[in-house]
Amino acid sequence: MTRLEKIYTDKVAPALNKEFGYKSSMEIPGIKAISLNIGLGEASQNAKLIDGAVEELTAIAGQRAVVTRAKKSIAAFKLREGMPVGSRVTLRRDLMWDFLDKLISFALPRVRDFRGIPDKGFDGRGNFTLGIKELTIFPEIQLDKIEITKGMNVTIVTSAKTDKEGKMLLELLGMPFKK
């Protein structure tokens, strides 16, 4: 059991149950998965960028990332169907808890002028999406190997039914939201 998972079972779940008064312990919101995504529009001209994105995402996540490909051809973007356009990985169980712990404890405090995460990333069903502008905030990324600075989307999928439940779950886990 990871550190953050232990915090969830010992402190967060009882606090959520007390706040919202669930009838069953299975109703208590939890984190189901974390999805990481890098979209690279420049990859249509330079295919080597995709390899770097896959390697960086694999290093950050601890799980092999897959290449995402264009579903349709778009002439304005010089894009053909099947061309690589990004990279993604979905984390579950222990890797998910390890990544969330690393994000909250190490990566977010390394963001320049960090004042907290805006809570506008909730989707209405308790899931939270956060954009990261630079991957260099993660300790696994080696600065000398980076060709271009890339950003990433992090989606935290929860079993919460409302944004209020999802926000409280993440706050109790230590996610630094803006006050």
Swiss-Prot record:
Statement: the UniProt record of this protein carries the keyword tRNA-binding: yes
Alphabetically ordered keywords of this record: Ribonucleoprotein, Ribosomal protein, RNA-binding, rRNA-binding, tRNA-binding
Keyword field contains tRNA-binding: yes
GO CC, alphabetical: ribonucleoprotein complex; ribosome
Domain of life of the source: Bacteria
Cysteine disulfide links: none
SUPFAM superfamilies per record: RL5-like
Pfam families in alphabetical order: Ribosomal_L5, Ribosomal_L5_C
GO-annotated biological processes: translation
Subunit structure: Part of the 50S ribosomal subunit; part of the 5S rRNA/L5/L18/L25 subcomplex. Contacts the 5S rRNA and the P site tRNA. Forms a bridge to the 30S subunit in the 70S ribosome.
Assigned protein family: Belongs to the universal ribosomal protein uL5 family.
Record's function text: This is one of the proteins that bind and probably mediate the attachment of the 5S RNA into the large ribosomal subunit, where it forms part of the central protuberance. In the 70S ribosome it contacts protein S13 of the 30S subunit (bridge B1b), connecting the 2 subunits; this bridge is implicated in subunit movement. Contacts the P site tRNA; the 5S rRNA and some of its associated proteins might help stabilize positioning of ribosome-bound tRNAs.
Listed name of the protein: Large ribosomal subunit protein uL5
The species this protein was found in: Maridesulfovibrio salexigens (strain ATCC 14822 / DSM 2638 / NCIMB 8403 / VKM B-1763)
Source species taxonomy: Bacteria, Pseudomonadati, Thermodesulfobacteriota, Desulfovibrionia, Desulfovibrionales
